[in-house]
Amino acid sequence: MGLFGKTQEKPPKELVNEWSLKIRKEMRVVDRQIRDIQREEEKVKRSVKDAAKKGQKEVCVVLAKEMIRSRKAVSKLYASKAHMNSVLMGMKNQLAVLRVAGSLQKSTEVMKAMQSLVKIPEIQATMRELSKEMMKAGIIEEMLEDTFESMDDQEEMEEAAEMEIDRILFEITAGALGKAPSKVTDALPEPEPAGAMAASEEGEEEEDEEDLEAMQSRLATLRS
């Protein structure tokens, strides 16, 4: 506490160092999320291969869409890391300016990076807090809340899912189809007939559905 009960402001250098530490901490969180999503994606890929061998087209489509969503999530997380690196560079510049001018200066580069970072759900809370502190310190201006969220184009998703399944099917058959299938509607390999398989088919389908739902749930949790 300062005089008359007022909170004493932290020195600019201390503020910059604190912001840099918080950003590096969030970068480690993002790295961990990327690894978790990619690890789960490998499991999904194996499940797609298994479903294709059983001739389960619908399961292939659902899982392929999950892979696409996961890859989009990873791309956004990598983009957020790039923005955080921009902010870190901006903090280094602020320290250099501070040594010469004796005060922090407004930065359009930091402003642009923070505008992008506050829109990312995984790190939104921390970035909003940092933005308020930076606004108070005069580094960035007040940012308007951008409520517009771009929606995934359904047709683009369908086409991407078809392309992903085509690629995976071609990989599974080791080129036995002669070429990569052009559409998901192309015939999938038929399951080999077996007497014992017919009796347990219903139970296996229920297990497959449960596994599919569990996998979707895990991926959704990792992306959120």
Curated annotation (Swiss-Prot):
<dbReference type="GO" id="GO:0005643">
    <property type="term" value="C:nuclear pore"/>
</dbReference>
<feature type="compositionally biased region" description="Acidic residues">
    <location>
        <begin position="201"/>
        <end position="213"/>
    </location>
</feature>
<dbReference type="GO" id="GO:0010824">
    <property type="term" value="P:regulation of centrosome duplication"/>
</dbReference>
<dbReference type="GO" id="GO:0071985">
    <property type="term" value="P:multivesicular body sorting pathway"/>
</dbReference>
<dbReference type="GO" id="GO:0051258">
    <property type="term" value="P:protein polymerization"/>
</dbReference>
<keyword id="KW-0813">Transport</keyword>
<dbReference type="GO" id="GO:0032467">
    <property type="term" value="P:positive regulation of cytokinesis"/>
</dbReference>
<dbReference type="GO" id="GO:0051469">
    <property type="term" value="P:vesicle fusion with vacuole"/>
</dbReference>
<dbReference type="GO" id="GO:0036258">
    <property type="term" value="P:multivesicular body assembly"/>
</dbReference>
<feature type="region of interest" description="Intramolecular interaction with N-terminus">
    <location>
        <begin position="151"/>
        <end position="222"/>
    </location>
</feature>
<dbReference type="GO" id="GO:0051036">
    <property type="term" value="P:regulation of endosome size"/>
</dbReference>
<dbReference type="GO" id="GO:1902774">
    <property type="term" value="P:late endosome to lysosome transport"/>
</dbReference>
<protein>
    <recommendedName>
        <fullName>Charged multivesicular body protein 3</fullName>
    </recommendedName>
</protein>
<dbReference type="GO" id="GO:1990381">
    <property type="term" value="F:ubiquitin-specific protease binding"/>
</dbReference>
<dbReference type="GO" id="GO:0032585">
    <property type="term" value="C:multivesicular body membrane"/>
</dbReference>
<feature type="modified residue" description="Phosphoserine">
    <location>
        <position position="200"/>
    </location>
</feature>
<dbReference type="GO" id="GO:0007080">
    <property type="term" value="P:mitotic metaphase chromosome alignment"/>
</dbReference>
<dbReference type="GO" id="GO:0046761">
    <property type="term" value="P:viral budding from plasma membrane"/>
</dbReference>
<feature type="region of interest" description="Interaction with STAMBP">
    <location>
        <begin position="205"/>
        <end position="209"/>
    </location>
</feature>
<feature type="lipid moiety-binding region" description="N-myristoyl glycine">
    <location>
        <position position="2"/>
    </location>
</feature>
<keyword id="KW-0175">Coiled coil</keyword>
<comment type="function">
    <text>Probable core component of the endosomal sorting required for transport complex III (ESCRT-III) which is involved in multivesicular bodies (MVBs) formation and sorting of endosomal cargo proteins into MVBs. MVBs contain intraluminal vesicles (ILVs) that are generated by invagination and scission from the limiting membrane of the endosome and mostly are delivered to lysosomes enabling degradation of membrane proteins, such as stimulated growth factor receptors, lysosomal enzymes and lipids. The MVB pathway appears to require the sequential function of ESCRT-O, -I,-II and -III complexes.</text>
</comment>
<dbReference type="GO" id="GO:0005886">
    <property type="term" value="C:plasma membrane"/>
</dbReference>
<dbReference type="GO" id="GO:2000641">
    <property type="term" value="P:regulation of early endosome to late endosome transport"/>
</dbReference>
<dbReference type="GO" id="GO:0039702">
    <property type="term" value="P:viral budding via host ESCRT complex"/>
</dbReference>
<dbReference type="GO" id="GO:0031468">
    <property type="term" value="P:nuclear membrane reassembly"/>
</dbReference>
<keyword id="KW-0519">Myristate</keyword>
<dbReference type="GO" id="GO:0030496">
    <property type="term" value="C:midbody"/>
</dbReference>
<dbReference type="Pfam" id="PF03357">
    <property type="entry name" value="Snf7"/>
</dbReference>
<feature type="site" description="Interaction with STAMBP">
    <location>
        <position position="218"/>
    </location>
</feature>
<dbReference type="GO" id="GO:0097352">
    <property type="term" value="P:autophagosome maturation"/>
</dbReference>
<feature type="region of interest" description="Disordered">
    <location>
        <begin position="180"/>
        <end position="224"/>
    </location>
</feature>
<comment type="subunit">
    <text>Probable core component of the endosomal sorting required for transport complex III (ESCRT-III). ESCRT-III components are thought to multimerize to form a flat lattice on the perimeter membrane of the endosome. Several assembly forms of ESCRT-III may exist that interact and act sequentially. Forms a metastable monomer in solution; its core structure (without part of the putative autoinhibitory C-terminal acidic region) oligomerizes into a flat lattice via two different dimerization interfaces.</text>
</comment>
<feature type="region of interest" description="Interaction with VPS4A">
    <location>
        <begin position="151"/>
        <end position="224"/>
    </location>
</feature>
<dbReference type="GO" id="GO:0005765">
    <property type="term" value="C:lysosomal membrane"/>
</dbReference>
<dbReference type="InterPro" id="IPR005024">
    <property type="entry name" value="Snf7_fam"/>
</dbReference>
<dbReference type="GO" id="GO:0000815">
    <property type="term" value="C:ESCRT III complex"/>
</dbReference>
<keyword id="KW-0832">Ubl conjugation</keyword>
<dbReference type="GO" id="GO:0006997">
    <property type="term" value="P:nucleus organization"/>
</dbReference>
<dbReference type="GO" id="GO:0005769">
    <property type="term" value="C:early endosome"/>
</dbReference>
<dbReference type="GO" id="GO:0061763">
    <property type="term" value="P:multivesicular body-lysosome fusion"/>
</dbReference>
<keyword id="KW-0653">Protein transport</keyword>
